[in-house]
Amino acid sequence: MNNNSSGGKAIRGLDVLILGFAFFATYFGAGNLIFPPQLGLNSGSDFLSGLAGLTLSGIFLPIFTLIVIGLNGDVHSITERVGKNTYNVLLAALMLVCTFVSIPRTCATAIQLGIQGNLPAAPFIPLVIAYFVISFFFVADQNNVMDRMGKYLTPLLALILVIVAFVGIFNPLGTPVAPAVDHPFVNAFLGGYNTGDVLVSFIMAAVFISSIYGKGYTTVGQRNKVLIYCGIVSFVLLLIIYGSLLYMGACVSGDYAQNIGRAELLVAIIQRVGTWVMVPMGIAVVLACLTTAIGQIAAVAEFTSTATGNRISYKQVAVACCILSALTALLGVDGIVTYIGWIFGICYPPCLALLVLGIIGRFMPNNSAYKGSVYLVTLFALLESLPGLSSLGFAKAIVAATPLSTYGFGWIVPFIIGLIGGSIIGHFVSASEPVEAEAK
């Protein structure tokens, strides 16, 4: 691969491979290791339909989101038509989610599932400290975070997973039985959709794009090409791993109850592959968690230092993030999960709305179309998920009456209403309003 965009250096295949591996590792957290077997268990003999649904929502959608953000320039280019402070508010909220939810959860999962699963007596607190010391080591060099991950951590993670996948595919664990759900495609699509990996694209976009620039690809054309190539590498890796895990779940669909826990099912599958897999899979869990944490700590540090005009340095923010996340990780997986649902429910719909706007933005007649859709989607998300508000009678009634809300797509109707209503209001009230940012 030696494509040469005018005014820049040739695109090197090794660079694409390293960055693509790093992108893959950032998306592939331990949660992504656990849920495909469950979807396979549900899909049974119709596992190909399940894989198609998971591929569309759990692989294509997040990577497509990243590419859309890149082609628009950055997240700010999409949000600025909603309002000048939208970018800072959105990213600040997502960075808080990283610091107090997703990063601590990776740590707790790595220790409880990856380490204590093999060494039950391993001490929790010292391991938490070690986890974030290692994370900071990789994060400290701002310009080479993705490069370090792609060179050292991700190849080992991918190697372990590919070996297990190879064994699981070519030495089937059983024979898939009839699907336990009526529509395996829809079930798997919703399973992938509800992982919320689209949020990762919004959180990590700046770090991903910065890592491409750091490789010397400084023109817009080069950046976009490398981003797309890296997306393809990441897509292929995720498809191989997800597909094999889903297939292994399908192969044991006649042996386990549908209500078996996700982690319990994964452990059962690993044991059936062979006890020799327990330690390598434990390492894979730790690496999957660690690479996700490293990427998100870097994102928090980069956003915060930039937002403060570097009055707080990148390294200072990284240290603070590690400390706060470590303290939160002490709650353990169960303690963190108790408050994760409503936070996810509020943040996810506005990001999906922005994704759609990033695609169709050039066709929007005015900025009010942006404002109306995002504001109404955010209001719906608050009614649906905010503790205290979501339990009120009127909020429940509105959510229940909204089409598709039972499937997690309730935001679509408010989005369409806001888009149309905003366009009309913008036409009559703000006809003279200039378009502040054209879609790129």
Where are these regions (language model features)?
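Membrane-helix boundary/coupling elements in multi-pass transport proteins
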Residues: 102-107, 278-309
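TM-loop-TM module centered on a large, flexible mid-protein loop between adjacent transmembrane helices
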Residues: 76-80, 240-290, 341-344
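Hydrophobic, small-residue-rich membrane helices and short re-entrant helix-turn-helix hairpins
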Residues: 141-152, 184-188, 208-237, 254-267, ...
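Hydrophobic, membrane-embedded alpha-helices of multi-pass small-molecule transporters
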Residues: 18-28, 95, 99, 165-174, ...
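Transmembrane alpha-helical segments of multi-pass small-molecule transport proteins
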Residues: 18-27, 55-58, 89-93, 118-140, ...
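A generic transmembrane alpha-helix motif of multi-pass inner-membrane proteins
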Residues: 164, 171, 367-440
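Membrane-water interface regions at transmembrane-helix termini and the short interhelical loops
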Residues: 70-77, 132-153, 214-217, 326-339, ...
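Membrane helical hairpin/interfacial module
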Residues: 40-136, 140
